[in-house]
Structure formats: structure tokens, C-alpha cells
Amino acid sequence: MTDTRNGEDNGKLLYCSFCGKSQHEVRKLIAGPSVFICDECVDLCNDIIREEVQEAQAESSAHKLPSPKEISGILDQYVIGQERAKKVLAVAVYNHYKRLNQRDKKNDDVELGKSNILLIGPTGSGKTLLAETLARLLNVPFTIADATTLTEAGYVGEDVENIIQKLLQKCDYDVDKAQMGIVYIDEIDKISRKSDNPSITRDVSGEGVQQALLKLIEGTVASVPPQGGRKHPQQEFLQVDTRNILFICGGAFSGLEKVIQNRSTRGGIGFNAEVRSKEEGKKVGESLREVEPDDLVKFGLIPEFVGRLPVLATLDELDEAALIQILTEPKNALTKQYAKLFEMEGVDLEFRTDALKSVARRALERKTGARGLRSILEGVLLDTMYEIPSQSDVSKVVIDESVIDGTSKPLLIYENSEPPAKVAPDA
């Protein structure tokens, strides 16, 4: 609406030429040649421009595919160690999106196939973090599915098509964006066949799920209910082509190392048998590096499913040194996160070296890998984070080994006084 009324100097109200609000309804009214615009309309215009710029930047960055070395370098900023897995993932992801960029070119005789990825590694070794970081780096939709909740269609549980629906939700049901996304299916080892022999009874959460995932991973057109799902059954289903969706499956595969060792150490019997001591046994990570498709079949994955995951990357168990690095070095390291939380209260947080070693040792004892580090720190810092917001004179908190072990409380350093002696926790 264009306002043609006289200005305030003539005793009349001024109105925004865009939304029609008077000068009393808004905080600010900016005058131009015969027009006015309010602060609310300016904010709205800024939001529209910002969204369009972000979309244009995302589109241009999608065309600028980083090289495998650049991908691996960015992964180094967030994931400690696992160099072999990073290299395998970087090459696989680079080739996948290079293939997508090639598909629009006409008169191309060679059709490039899709290479989905299988990550094998102990709990807390960084499988999910690697997949999340890749998706963030490439600016593509990403979703995580839990294989343990999946069942065959018609049974209680989630259908495999629900995975695609989650991916659509991540990109506001933009089918074109979803068709270039990444899906990470966790706990894939939990849907292994319960025995080597085909069972007479139906295995709806094991082999049945593998069969259901086959076509989805290889490439099919999945029918997914739109927003609202069953609430609006009259709506047409969305058709999502999964041929260009990159599937990354991950699992701990506990016991797989024994299958590999049995295969690799198979030898003669009697006098021809090679004698080995228990000390000569390989570590889990070393054994997993020698995995072959047949080992996965013996573990319980069906051959057709293994064939759909041609790229194999194994992750090593994290030792104490790696866990200490994880605590301190990545961009989003846990010690940096907690230091930021304390900084918001105007307090410095310091972790002594012996404290970091103690945290790493406790995580190793729990066999939770890097995933257990946060729960340990959360338990140690809980009381301090509860008290600090109520105390305005604390300038620094120091955590040492005795605090992690539970034999003393964190050392609080006050602004204008000597720090009090540490007090043992109440019995």
C-alpha cells in the first residue's frame, strides 16, 4: 500500500508503505522519496536476502567438490586417528559425488556405479562422527537410522522406507535434495542372521531386514508418505529415487575378529600344526583390517547384502593417547566445550594433564571408547556447574587426577582471596 498522506509535520500520522502500520505501531519509520518503510519490513527484507544468499552459496559449494586430500584434512579437525578409514571414506565420497556431477552429461557411454560404504570398528571409535562430519562438509541432507528398530514390512517396528522419510524431513521434503543425501545406518551388525543355515521360522528383524534393505541401498524408487503421513491418506506419496543416495552402514561386529583369526590361522593338525602362544594373538583392530567378504557372510550378513557395500573401512580401537587427544585437540573437543560453558559464567576451567590421563583410563575400563568421555566429565563437573552460577567471586576451577578419582573436590580459585584448601568429599 502506498501512503500519499502528508507528513507528521502537518499533524498527520505516517504509515509504512509496505505493511501499512502507523508510526506508533513500530519502533522506527524510515522516510524515502514519497515512501516510508518500518523497521519490521527492513528485518523481513534482510531475512529474505540472507536466505537467498545462503541458498546460492550452498548451490555453488555443492559444485565445488573438495579433493580427497581436502576431505581427509577436514576430517582431521574433528576425528582423531583412524587415518586409513579417513582415506577410504574420502576417496569413496569424492568418487560418489563426482559420479553425480557426471550424470547430467549426455553422450557418455560409461555409466558409473554407486559404491556404498561399510564401517567396522569398536564402540566409540568414531564411525558416526565420520559420517556426520562428511555430510556437514558436503552440505547435503544427512540422517541416522538405527538398524535394531527396523523390521520387515507388515510387522511391528519401523519399515526401511522410514529411513528415506527421515532424510526428507531433514531437507523440508525437498525430493531433489534428499536424492543427493547421505544415510548412516548404525548397528548394522545387529541384523545379522542368527545362524549360518537358513531358518524355517521367519527372522523379521535379522535376515528379513537385510532383504528389505537390499533394493533401497542398491537403488530403487521408494514411495514415502508426505508430511502428515497417515493423517492425510488422500495425499499422493512422494517418489524418491535412492540410486544417488550414499548409504554408509556401521557396526561394532563384536566377535568378527574371531572369525577372521580362525580363517587366517587355519593350518595343519598334529605334527604339522603351527604352535602359537596366546601372546602372539593380534589386537582386534589388527584382525579387522584383514576382513574379507566371506568373513562377513560367516558372521551373519547375507552375500547379496555384503555385495551392496563394496567399500570397506575398518577403525582401530582407541588407546589412552588417542582418547587424551580427543579430549583436547579437535575443534569441538570436550574440554573446549566445558571451558566455553564456564567462560559464559566468567570462570576459567583448567584440566591438568594427570586429570586427562585419568579420564582416558576410566573410559578404557568402561570399554565405551570416546563415547564414554562426556559422561565421565559430566559426572565430575556436575556439582561445580550447579554451584558456580550462584558464586560471583570464583575466577578459576582446576581439575586434577584426584578430582577424577573422586578423592577430592575441584579446586576453586577466588578473585580477591587465597584459594581454600581442597576438601575431601563427604563420606
From Swiss-Prot:
UniProt-annotated binding residues for ATP: P122, T123, G124, S125, G126, K127, T128, L129
Purpose of the protein: ATP-dependent specificity component of the Clp protease. It directs the protease to specific substrates. Can perform chaperone functions in the absence of ClpP.
Annotated Gene Ontology cellular component terms: HslUV protease complex
Keywords associated with the record: ATP-binding, Chaperone, Metal-binding, Nucleotide-binding, Zinc
Superkingdom of the organism of origin: Bacteria
Similarity comment text for this entry: Belongs to the ClpX chaperone family.
SMART domains documented for this protein: AAA (SM00382), ClpB_D2-small (SM01086), zf-C4_ClpX (SM00994)
Subunit comment: Component of the ClpX-ClpP complex. Forms a hexameric ring that, in the presence of ATP, binds to fourteen ClpP subunits assembled into a disk-like structure with a central cavity, resembling the structure of eukaryotic proteasomes.
Name used for this protein in its record: ATP-dependent Clp protease ATP-binding subunit ClpX
Annotated GO biological process: cell division; proteolysis involved in protein catabolic process
Residues involved in Zn(2+) binding: C16, C19, C38, C41
Gene3D superfamilies: 1.10.8.60, ClpX chaperone, C4-type zinc finger domain, P-loop containing nucleotide triphosphate hydrolases
Residue ranges of every copy of the ClpX-type ZB domain listed in the record: 4-57
One GO molecular-function entry: unfolded protein binding
